[in-house]
Curated annotation (Swiss-Prot):
Source organism of this protein record: Nocardia farcinica (strain IFM 10152)
One protein family per Pfam: SMC_N
Location of the protein in the cell: Cytoplasm
Task of the protein: The RecF protein is involved in DNA metabolism; it is required for DNA replication and normal SOS inducibility. RecF binds preferentially to single-stranded, linear DNA. It also seems to bind ATP.
Name under which the protein is recorded: DNA replication and repair protein RecF
Family membership noted in the UniProt record: Belongs to the RecF family.
Biological processes, Gene Ontology terms: DNA replication; DNA synthesis involved in DNA repair; double-strand break repair; SOS response
Length: 388
């Protein structure tokens, strides 16, 4: 899989750009703030409908513009598709496949797959549980694009159920409120079970790739492992050696419904939903010790990189090889990690890299350079490709 063409209009610092790309390695070169990372962010957005840098879409729209547009021609196994997304201020985003509108933007998911490694990835190890849940869910969705709808439905039901818990808790828990809560419990459990089943399957499948990737990056370190942690699931589901089963979602739905009923009194008292995948955690371990809070800076970098390399290997083992995005990371890595990452990049179908100077990129990658610069007055500078 590779991106043959990329177009941006009013996206971040780019007023307009049309790029022709090829397989192999391309490096966008430029000083910090020139907009090179915005190009990778745009490619990643088309793959995930989200940014690795911000949680909302508004910052992606160029200052002074009402909307931004991102599009790409994606080639996979000889077949080319065009995908476009329009990000709008104050209204719903819109998407097209081959210039034809689709009902929901998430219908483009799966056409382009990417794996991105960026300095922000240190938060996968050192950050809050939400960072690791997002990592799980984005990778699950890359493997099963229809899961995007399940995630959206779960988030919607969670918001509505949480609002009802607050209302019912304040108003003496009327029979009508409690009856409505029963209905929302059923919806929540159904969506949650599908999401948790896919997370468990992913952790099981990713584990051997993660262990091998970390071993190659830090052979002298303790072995790395991942596990799924949940307060409401029986231990049998959390055993990393347990193979996922096709009927897991049905069994999980019954468990979650039972746990919701048991937790209802506490939930009404506190006005929050205490059961569900929004409270679960991806556990990262080095030997018998949690990586968060105990791993050194070097170990944390190795674990973050191993998670991304494992994701890349897992995706290409089961579907089309994803586009590898490397955002200003070679300068952050020591020799061993640079060598390991360069080996993967050298073998990938398409790699898009950002760097401040050519020397930051290993020479053996022989990357095609594209220089990026900015022009204009302070506060209104726009990015452009340097030609000639």
């Amino acid at each position: 899989m590779f991106v043959r063409a990329l177009s941006l209009r009013d996206f971040r610092s780019w007023e307009h750009v049309e790029l022709e790309l090829s397989t192999g390695r391309t490096v966008f070169l430029g000083a910090n703030g020139n907009g090179k990372t915005n190009l990778l962010e745009a490619v990643g957005y088309l793959a995930t409908l989200g940014s690795h840098r911000v949680s909302a879409d508004a910052p992606l729209i160029r200052s002074g513009a009402q909307r931004a547009r991102v599009g790409a021609n994606v080639v996979n196994a000889g077949r080319e598709l065009r995908i476009d997304v329009e990000l709008n201020q104050g209204s719903a985003n819109r998407a097209q496949i081959n210039r034809s509108p689709v009902r929901r933007t998430r219908e483009i998911l799966g056409i382009l797959q990417t794996v991105l490694f960026a300095p922000e990835d240190l938060a996968l190890v050192r950050g809050d549980p939400g960072e690791r849940r997002r990592f799980l869910d984005e990778l699950c969705t890359a493997r099963l694009p229809r899961l995007a709808g399940v995630r959206a439905d779960y988030d919607r039901v969670l918001r509505q159920r949480s609002a009802l818990l607050k209302t019912a808790g304040r108003h003496a828990r009327s029979t009508a409120d409690l009856s409505t809560l029963d209905v929302w419990d059923g919806h929540l459990a159904g969506h949650a079970a599908v999401l948790v089943a896919q997370r468990l399957r992913l952790v099981h499948d990713l584990f051997p790739y993660l262990a091998e990737a970390y071993r190659s990056l830090a052979p002298e370190s303790r072995p790395a492992a991942i596990g799924y942690r949940s307060a409401y699931l029986p231990g049998e589901f959390l055993d990393p050696a347990r193979a996922p089963r096709d009927d897991d979602a049905a069994a999980l739905e019954e468990i979650i419904l039972r746990e919701l009923a048991a937790a209802r009194r506490k939930e009404l008292e506190r006005g929050v939903c205490l059961v569900g995948p929004h409270r679960d955690e991806l556990e990262l371990m080095l030997g018998d010790t949690p990586a968060k809070g105990f791993a050194s800076h070097g170990e944390s970098w190795s674990f973050a990189l191993a998670l991304r390399l494992a994701s890349f290997d897992l995706l290409r083992s089961t579907s089309a090889e994803p586009v590898l995005l490397l955002d200003d990371v070679f300068a952050e890595l020591d020799r061993r990690r640079r060598t390991a990452l360069a080996a993967v990049a050298a073998d990938a179908e398409q790699v898009l890299i950002t760097a401040a100077v050519p020397e930051d990129v290993p020479a053996e990658l022989s990357a095609t350079p594209i220089r990026v610069a900015t022009a204009g007055e302070a506060g209104h500078r726009t990015s452009h490709i340097v030609t000639g």
